[in-house]
Curated annotation (Swiss-Prot):
Protein name: DNA polymerase sliding clamp 1
Record text on subunit structure and interactions: Homotrimer. The subunits circularize to form a toroid; DNA passes through its center. Replication factor C (RFC) is required to load the toroid on the DNA. Interacts with TIP.
InterPro entries xref list: DNA_clamp_sf, Pr_cel_nuc_antig, Pr_cel_nuc_antig_C, Pr_cel_nuc_antig_CS, Pr_cel_nuc_antig_N
GO MF annotations in UniProt: DNA binding; DNA polymerase processivity factor activity; identical protein binding
Amino acid sequence: MPFEVVFDGAKEFADLIATASNLIDEAAFKFTEEGISMRAMDPSRVVLIDLNLPESIFSKYEVEEPETIGINMDQFKKILKRGKAKDTLILRKGDENFLEITFEGTAKRTFRLPLIDVEELELELPELPFTAKVVLLGEVLKEGIKDASLVSDAIKFIAKENEFTMKAEGETNEVEIRLTLEDEGLLDLEVEEETKSAYGIRYLSDMVKGIGKADEVILRFGNEMPLQMEYMIRDEGRLTFLLAPRVEE
């Protein structure tokens, strides 16, 4: 069998895939001895997604040889949503062109998902000269984006010494969420210079859907530069987004 991997906690894995599927229709997943990885760009080429799941976060990880499989993300998401929080998730692939998805809990349920041909693009996650790094709770970021969506389709992030602000302005109203290091929601802040950049709320809303309230989210950005948003999966895995800025006129 080319590979068999086991992940304890099916819902957590499902949330990861659901988040990515909000932005991309299909993806090529690479299974290697080191772990599972996926890198893709949304159809509008505004968001780059980078998923890295090392073999250490799986309770069982057996990959005979490196293999890349193409998956329809919407179908994958719908199947994974059938898993429960305490279910064990098993992903298997034999010689046939199917991914076998099994949930083991109160019963053993197995789905077979046909694999598809996906063009593999050579996408690089660039190293950019960010001037601000913000670490905050997922709940704070999600609520800030929801607040901003009431007044605008864009949100501005502003970082300066000891203060991080999320701000949105509409034609008649505005909202501002200000955090300092004294607030529980802001965990860390590193600023080389006062930094401002705006981003589309539609994309951000999709990017944060899978983030838990207590998750730590890392934001890196520069003046009118892309936003790099990252959160960890069981301390060693990582889901990273790179979102193009909304350049103001």
